[in-house]
Design a protein with these regions (language model features):
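Generic structural motif
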Residues: 14-16, 56
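A short, surface-exposed loop/turn module that caps and links secondary-structure elements
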Residues: 46-73
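Enriched for short, Lys/Arg-rich terminal
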Residues: 1-13, 24, 35, 73-114
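N-terminal first-folded block
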Residues: 17-52
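Terminal low-complexity, poorly structured segments
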Residues: 41, 55, 101-102
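Residues that form or immediately flank small-molecule/cofactor binding pockets and catalytic motifs
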Residues: 21, 64, 99
Length: 114
């Protein structure tokens, strides 16, 4: 029998804050994915949101609304969340949530240039 121990990172927890426009972005995504999106954001961004991983990276240039980071998740990394970290308030501000279809990124149902 193999036992795998998993420990949570001991970093401080960040509060997740959503920009008002994000509500419209989520409405453009099929409802069956809403819980996956919420769970992924909470699991991956509350602790160490500014540590680069395989699916989380700093943006070379801000894509939308001043976002400095992107996280990818879901089936085939279909979903994208763009955010910035506010260290003073210990908050992660979610600025946009999109869906990648082929080479197109759709945010709020509108194509956005990468």
């Amino acid at each position: 029998m193999t036992i795998i121990m998993v420990t949570m990172p001991s970093g401080k927890r960040f509060e997740i804050v959503y920009a008002p426009i994000v509500k419209q972005h989520v409405k453009a995504i099929d409802r069956k994915h809403h819980s996956l999106i919420k769970e992924a954001i909470e699991a991956q961004l509350q602790v160490e949101p500014d540590v680069e991983t395989r699916n989380r990276r700093p943006l070379k240039r801000p894509v939308t609304l001043g976002a400095k980071w992107e996280i990818r998740f879901g089936p085939h990394n279909r979903f994208r969340v763009f955010y910035k970290v506010n260290y003073d308030d210990e908050q992660v501000e979610i600025l946009a949530i999109g869906e990648k279809e082929g080479s197109q990124l759709l945010i709020g149902g509108e194509e956005v240039a990468l």
